[in-house]
């Protein structure tokens, strides 16, 4: 029984029972808490005997503490109980659990300091399993078989659930790589998981090698080599080397590094086995908060995140994803609330009852004059203050004062306070000269006059002092603030001690440091940290300094500084603040994907001319502020290269951002497509603008810039490469388009709202501006727009400013009253590559939007299959003909017109053949707005009507996108054909208004199916069957006139055989035929009336259908005893299907009438499909009244039973439930006495292995008779587990289930005791479900058998220690040994030879029994074996 009541005795027990569970609570610790703690320790494979001593308790606390952050409430309760018990053992006086935890924390902090001090003094490692021998040398002590067994058990039990990771962490603490490999080998049977783990370890090892290159030259004597990735993984290093690294000076913790790699891999495995994200865990409307917390923490343990991130998730997501009722309570508790407080506050929340209580509480507070807070009711009424005017007593939304512009928090315009990201706009804000909102008096024009990314230093003096860079303001309340731009270094002329010098205003420097200046007075020496190291300076106090007319006195340092610096000690005294005014373009915050780091791709070699070109380009970009030089502290890199521009000698810099793109967060494409010219309205005046260096005008998020680092190498590695990072959006980075489009839209918004009569089409850096103004006025507005863009840093170059038609825009050519695509030249080639054909198809597709009749189907066929871009393609005759037709179409230029909103749209569609269609959209005949083509084939079996609907839907979608409305359609199909198709077609689709146009070729239906059976025609029942393994099948039919036929098929499937059967029926029937099938697949194909198909058999069926005068096709469900269908099914199933017919329906119904078993049991016992079994249950008048009880499985040990008494018909029924399986033993007892209960328990113990019984506190269960039986049968009795929500839940649930079954069979029995036993039989053997789909009877047997096998396995593990192994090393042919056998697997054994643990293949090991002690060395081994 382990540590139970023997843990405490005498005075210690008295002290234990005086300690309260909670501060100020009534409940105190009792003996049952010790019993519960010892049971819980057994679950965690910890020895309950440790509870008997203070040292044991300390060991338990050390094991449990690492798992507290991610553990359940039960784990925390166990930790608290053991902490209190430790205090009792140590005779530390504590009053409650909280006080005990504080004492433990103090003790742990002291121990930690002591350990750190000792380690610092001695330099020795305290890590297990590295221990010191008698000579003080570190030696390796292998992991014990007990530890390995615990690890195997946790993997087998938990199956890579989140609990595996903390368990691995705890078991592998301080282990060497060799120990860790041993742990992985013993669970090597999980091949998929181990492969994932291996891949992760290989990746991390490769990354280690990359970051830690091998130093050139020989290793100095006495110095160890540096470990490689494979050494850390233990594959190319010995235990002695690993110990050397771990205990060296400085140490290299190879064990911890390898552990970290394994935990990374385990996280991936856990993620695969537990795919639910923490973001998906949300509390249901009526879900108890405790259940939600359990689900939340279970998922949290599977998340691949650091502990800090997990803590953040707990603090924010737990509250954020709670339901509204709980969320309001949790927010009222405040951010510092503990989980225990949350769970207490949210008890009973949810459902109508809670709503009623909240409503009643709200109604009761209507009469009260003061508002009371949920916490701190005696703090008085809450004082509210207006953000707008600053007065108390009202909120900003009710303020009558004029609303102040900009944000109420930071004073900036462009956003509201709720969107404000400013935390502290100014450093040292207490020294700000202006109060409240006075800083907002600056006009936006003045702030924007600077460069796009400017930051400014403002002097907040109260006096109107003149300064060159200042901005003067008139008015009584205004101040003059000198302004220094930070676009360049803020160098100003200052007067110090009467001398004028130029100095840098540096808000990042603490002190004012000057060079080459003679100051009066005494000085004292001082050393300060400067750029590049420490510098010696002279310190002068009380020196007068004047900056921009502002005077102050302070300390000045004089010494060899690279530049004169005015530091914060002076700047703060004159009221100088660092301001970040609204950046003309706000940076969009960007992050990497979770758990990813920036790119670390090496720069590849470049030619001399490319290096020179890149150096020149980068120098220019650096001057413009687009990139900045960086130092070696940035570990990231992306390759850069250069190409020559088209038709030019100039070079173009390209950066290969593929790796960064993979790692960058995803963006939403702001613009979903490109604007089309057909949607443009005709305008009197038009201008096309292009934004120069578009991306380079938008700043990149400062925190993200480091990831864009790149290196310009030198020739022959003459010097280290020059490193840069981007300050603006880079070309080729995935985020640039979205961020640019978003920024551009915000910038154009004010101009659009001021000029609603001007149309601006924006796509990336191309702008189309149209208006109905006269040309002079229009051009004035254009200049206004250009100035507006320039104020935000966007330049519109003159060379790309198109004032006169034709305008080239987005690949189109725009004229005042018409448009076309820019001229297209199709190349003439003798040989075509795959790349050439791809470009050709792209050009033709682009031309097809205005040139009607373009086809590309035959050209696209040439590209089928996986081909390289440079492969030569031979044009087929069809492709050459198609290309020649396209050339003819493109010879004559075609123009489209502009859209007139006052006229209707019309769309006309023509069939071109070979599944190709063309269409034109116009408002006036022969003046097309747009044309297009359609050649997509959506399904294998189709007809022209179906394809026509697909074209109509494509044109409708296109029209909605371009014009916002749907055109009227003119289609080449007659109304009768259309209606015949759509009346019967099962997959109805919406079609807009249309009219018939007689444009050959017309669309028609080639055959039609009848709606009703054909009188007098022969009826064919068809069916097919195929065997999945052999691919053999049969198809056949049976007719109502006695005819039948079966044909054998090879390499077929069930679906093909069904179609073959229909073909047989059509082949052997007359001109009129009725066909009945049980295949929904075949029915769906034929009812759609296809006229062509990719399937040969479907094409043959179509040919036969066209030949027939009338065909009726019908469907019946299979296996329902329908005459002809059943006959043909038996005919084709012979020798093909394994299970033929449901002969068991009658037997199942008869069985259900007797036992009322559930559908799972019938499906299993009588081989019925679930739908049939459920139908039997649904048709039973006794089973359909209530829903079937749901059974879960509680994770408990095999020997635990719950007992309870229930009452029915005035009699007592004693019920015992095996918790793990749900198996029931029940009996009607004469009276609810201890004697009867004891007799029942004795009978139960005689039938099943009973270790623990869990009962309530009824007098019969607490009687002396029951205690005596439990003592005799060695049964432990429990009356309740602290903090366990299960309590008596299992047996209470079974009581209800048992009564329900008794109600169903009560009529069949005369006496209640008979009905009870019948109900027990039904529950145990006639109801299936839960894990494995077992009945309760099958499950209990399975659980007990598994338990016996597990114990036997453990015995075998202990037995193998009695064997010794002689083995041969791969490099040495001499046999070694004897070694101790630790583990025997299928292909290898784990052995211990002296202090080394090795894995040896079975073929190189000889295992023999140890028949006696050896003469030397075995005493040590035996001692260690006993310890294990």
UniProtKB/Swiss-Prot annotation:
**One protein family per Pfam:** Integrase_Zn
**Residues the record lists as binding Zn(2+):** 1152, 1156, 1180, 1183
Which residue ranges does the record annotate as region Interaction with membrane phosphatidylinositol 4,5-bisphosphate? 73-77
Region (Interaction with host AP3D1) residue spans: 12-19
Q: Where is the Reverse transcriptase domain?
A: 624-814
Q: Where is this site: Essential for RT p66/p51 heterodimerization?
A: 981, 994
- From which residue to which do the CCHC-type zinc fingers run? 384-401, 405-422
Which residues participate in Mg(2+) 2 binding? 1023, 1058, 1078, 1129
- Comp. bias intervals (Polar residues): 114-130, 444-456
GO annotation, cellular component aspect: host cell; host cell nucleus; host cell plasma membrane; host multivesicular body; membrane; viral nucleocapsid; virion membrane
Q: Which residues bind Mg(2+) 1?
A: 690, 765-766
User: Catalytic activity, per the record?
Assistant: Specific for a P1 residue that is hydrophobic, and P1' variable, but often Pro; Endohydrolysis of RNA in RNA/DNA hybrids. Three different cleavage modes: 1. sequence-specific internal cleavage of RNA. Human immunodeficiency virus type 1 and Moloney murine leukemia virus enzymes prefer to cleave the RNA strand one nucleotide away from the RNA-DNA junction. 2. RNA 5'-end directed cleavage 13-19 nucleotides from the RNA end. 3. DNA 3'-end directed cleavage 15-20 nucleotides away from the primer terminus; 3'-end directed exonucleolytic cleavage of viral RNA-DNA hybrid; DNA(n) + a 2'-deoxyribonucleoside 5'-triphosphate = DNA(n+1) + diphosphate
Q: At which residues does the record annotate a lipid attachment of kind N-myristoyl glycine?
A: 2
The protein here is known as Gag-Pol polyprotein
């Amino acid at each position: 029984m382990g540590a139970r009541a023997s843990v405490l005795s005498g005075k210690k027990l008295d002290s234990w029972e005086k300690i309260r569970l909670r501060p100020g609570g009534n409940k105190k610790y009792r003996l049952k808490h010790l019993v519960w703690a010892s049971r819980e320790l057994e679950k965690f494979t910890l020895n309950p005997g440790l509870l008997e001593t203070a040292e044991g308790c300390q060991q338990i606390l050390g094991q449990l503490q690492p798992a507290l952050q991610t553990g359940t409430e039960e784990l925390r309760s166990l930790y608290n109980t053991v902490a209190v018990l430790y205090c009792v053992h140590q005779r530390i006086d504590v009053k409650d659990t909280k006080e005990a935890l504080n004492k433990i924390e103090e003790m742990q902090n002291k121990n930690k300091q002591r350990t750190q001090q000792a380690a610092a003094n001695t330099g020795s490692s305290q890590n297990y399993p590295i221990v010191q021998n008698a000579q003080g040398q570190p030696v390796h002590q292998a992991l014990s078989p007990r530890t390995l067994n615990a690890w195997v058990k946790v993997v087998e039990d938990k199956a890579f659930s989140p609990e595996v990771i903390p368990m691995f962490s705890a078991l592998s603490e301080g282990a060497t790589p060799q120990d860790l490999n041993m742990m992985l080998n013993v669970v090597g049977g999980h091949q998929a998981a181990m492969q994932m783990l291996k891949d992760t370890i290989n990746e991390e090892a490769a990354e280690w090698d990359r970051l830690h290159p091998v130093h050139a030259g020989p290793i100095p004597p006495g110095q160890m080599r540096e470990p490689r990735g494979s050494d850390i993984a233990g594959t190319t290093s010995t235990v002695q080397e690993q110990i050397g690294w771990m205990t060296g000076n400085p140490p290299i913790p190879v064990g911890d590094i390898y552990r970290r790699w394994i935990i990374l891999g385990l996280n991936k495995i856990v993620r695969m086995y537990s795919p639910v994200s923490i973001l998906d865990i949300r509390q249901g409307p009526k879900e108890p908060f405790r259940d939600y917390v359990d689900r939340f923490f279970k998922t949290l343990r599977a998340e691949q995140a650091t502990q800090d991130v997990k803590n953040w998730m707990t603090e924010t997501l737990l509250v954020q994803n709670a339901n509204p009722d709980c969320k309001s309570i949790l927010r009222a508790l405040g951010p510092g609330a503990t989980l225990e407080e949350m769970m207490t506050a949210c008890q009973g929340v949810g459902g109508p009852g809670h709503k009623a209580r909240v409503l009643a509480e709200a109604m009761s507070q209507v009469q009260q004059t003061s508002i009371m807070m949920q916490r701190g009711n005696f703090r008085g009424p809450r004082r509210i203050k207006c953000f707008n005017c600053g007065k108390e007593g009202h909120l900003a939304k009710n303020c009558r004062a004029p609303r102040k512009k900009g944000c109420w928090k930071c004073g900036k315009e462009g956003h509201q306070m709720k969107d404000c990201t400013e935390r502290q706009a100014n450093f040292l804000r207490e020294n700000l000269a202006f109060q409240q909102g006075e800083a907002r008096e600056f006009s936006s024009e003045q702030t924007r006059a600077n460069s796009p990314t400017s930051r400014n230093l403002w002097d907040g003096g109260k006096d109107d002092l003149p300064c060159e860079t200042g901005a003067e303001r008139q008015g009584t309340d205004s101040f003059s603030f000198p302004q220094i731009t930070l676009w360049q270094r803020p160098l100003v002329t200052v007067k110090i001690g009467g001398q004028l010098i130029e100095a840098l205003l540096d808000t990042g420097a603490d002190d004012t440091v000057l060079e080459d200046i003679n100051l009066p007075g005494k000085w004292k020496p001082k050393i300060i940290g400067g750029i590049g190291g420490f510098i010696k300076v002279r310190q002068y106090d009380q020196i007068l300094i004047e900056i921009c007319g502002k005077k102050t006195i302070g300390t000045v340092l004089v010494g060899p500084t690279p530049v004169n610096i005015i530091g914060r000690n002076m700047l703060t005294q004159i009221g100088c603040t660092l301001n970040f005014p609204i950046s003309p373009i706000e940076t969009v915050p960007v992050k990497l994907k979770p758990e990813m780091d920036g790119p670390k791709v090496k720069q590849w070699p470049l030619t001399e001319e490319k290096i020179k070109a890149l150096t020149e380009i980068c120098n220019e970009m650096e001057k413009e502020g687009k990139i900045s030089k960086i130092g070696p502290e940035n570990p990231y890199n992306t390759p850069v290269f250069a190409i020559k521009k088209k038709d030019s000698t100039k070079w173009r810099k390209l950066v290969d951002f593929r790796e960064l793109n993979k790692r960058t967060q995803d963006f939403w494409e702001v613009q979903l497509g490109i604007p089309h010219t057909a949607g443009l309205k005709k305008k009197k005046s038009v201008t096309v603008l292009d934004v120069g260096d578009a991306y380079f005008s938008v700043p990149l998020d400062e925190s993200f810039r480091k990831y864009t680092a790149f290196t310009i190498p030198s020739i022959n590695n003459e010097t280290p490469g020059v490193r840069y990072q981007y300050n603006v959006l880079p070309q080729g980075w995935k985020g640039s388009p979205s961020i640019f489009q978003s920024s551009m839209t915000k910038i154009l918004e004010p101009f659009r709202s001021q000029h609603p009569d001007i149309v601006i089409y924006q796509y990336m850096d191309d702008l189309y501006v149209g208006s109905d103004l006269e040309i002079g006025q229009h051009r004035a507005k254009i200049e206004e727009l250009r100035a507006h863009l320039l104020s935000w840093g966007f330049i519109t170059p003159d060379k790309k400013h198109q004032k006169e038609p034709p305008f080239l825009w987005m690949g189109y050519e725009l004229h005042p009253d018409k448009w076309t695509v820019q001229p297209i030249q199709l190349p003439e080639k003798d040989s075509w590559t795959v790349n050439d054909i791809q470009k050709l198809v792209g050009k033709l597709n682009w031309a097809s939007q205005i040139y009607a009749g373009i086809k590309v189907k035959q050209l696209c066929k040439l590209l089928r299959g996986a081909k390289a871009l440079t492969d030569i393609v031979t044009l087929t005759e069809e492709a050459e003909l198609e290309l020649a037709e396209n050339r003819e179409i493109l010879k004559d230029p075609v123009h489209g017109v502009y859209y007139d909103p006052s006229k209707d749209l019309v769309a006309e569609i023509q069939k071109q053949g070979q599944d190709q269609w063309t269409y034109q959209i116009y408002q006036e005949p022969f003046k097309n707005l747009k044309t297009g083509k359609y050649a997509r084939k959506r399904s294998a079996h189709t007809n022209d009507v179906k394809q026509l609907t697909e074209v109509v839907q494509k044109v409708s979608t296109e029209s909605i996108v371009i014009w916002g409305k749907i055109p009227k359609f003119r289609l080449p199909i007659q109304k009768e054909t259309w209606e015949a198709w759509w009346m019967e077609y099962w997959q109805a689709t919406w079609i807009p208004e249309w009219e018939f146009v007689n444009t050959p070729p017309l669309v028609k239906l080639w055959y039609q199916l009848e709606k009703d059976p054909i009188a007098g025609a022969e009826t064919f029942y068809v069916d097919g069957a195929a065997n999945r393994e052999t691919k053999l099948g049969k198809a056949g039919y049976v007719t109502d006139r006695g005819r039948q036929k079966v044909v054998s098929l090879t390499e077929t499937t069930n679906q093909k055989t069904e179609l073959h059967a229909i073909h047989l029926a059509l082949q052997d029937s007359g001109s009129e035929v009725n066909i009945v099938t049980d295949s929904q697949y075949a029915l769906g194909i034929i009812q759609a009336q296809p006229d062509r198909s990719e399937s040969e058999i479907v094409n043959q069926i179509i040919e036969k259908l066209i030949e027939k005068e009338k065909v009726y096709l019908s469907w019946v469900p299979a296996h329902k005893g329908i005459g002809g269908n059943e006959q043909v099914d038996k005919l084709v199933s012979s020798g093909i299907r394994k299970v033929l017919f449901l002969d068991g329906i009658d037997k199942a119904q008869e069985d259900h009438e007797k036992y009322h078993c559930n559908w799972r049991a019938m499906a299993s016992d009588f081989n019925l499909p679930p739908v049939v079994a459920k139908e039997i249950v649904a048709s039973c008048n006794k089973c359909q009244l209530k829903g079937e009880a749901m059974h879960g499985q509680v994770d408990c040990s095999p020997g635990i039973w719950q007992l309870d008494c229930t009452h029915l018909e005035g009699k007592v029924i004693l019920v015992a439930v095996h918790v793990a399986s749900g198996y029931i033993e029940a009996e009607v007892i004469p009276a609810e006495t201890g004697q009867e209960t004891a007799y029942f328990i004795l009978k139960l113990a005689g039938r099943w292995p009973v270790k623990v019984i869990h009962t309530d506190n009824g007098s019969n269960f607490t009687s002396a008779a029951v205690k005596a039986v439990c003592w005799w049968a060695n049964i432990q009795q429990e009356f309740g587990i602290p903090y366990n929500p299960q309590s008596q839940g299992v047996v209470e649930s079974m009581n209800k289930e048992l009564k329900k079954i008794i109600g169903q069979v009560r009529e069949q029995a005369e006496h209640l005791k008979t009905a009870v036993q019948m109900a027990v039989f039904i529950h145990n053997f006639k109801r299936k479900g839960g894990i494995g789909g077992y009945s309760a009877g099958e499950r209990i047997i399975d659980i007990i058998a598994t338990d016996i096998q597990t114990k036997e396995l453990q015995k075998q593990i202990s037995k193998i220690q009695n064997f010794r192994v002689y083995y041969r090393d791969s490099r040495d042919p001499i046999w070694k040994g004897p070694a101790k056998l630790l583990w025997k697997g299928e292909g290898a054994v784990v052995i211990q030879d002296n202090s080394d643990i090795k894995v040896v293949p079975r073929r190189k090991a000889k295992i023999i029994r140890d028949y006696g002690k050896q003469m030397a060395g075995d005493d040590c081994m035996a001692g260690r074996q006993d310890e294990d």
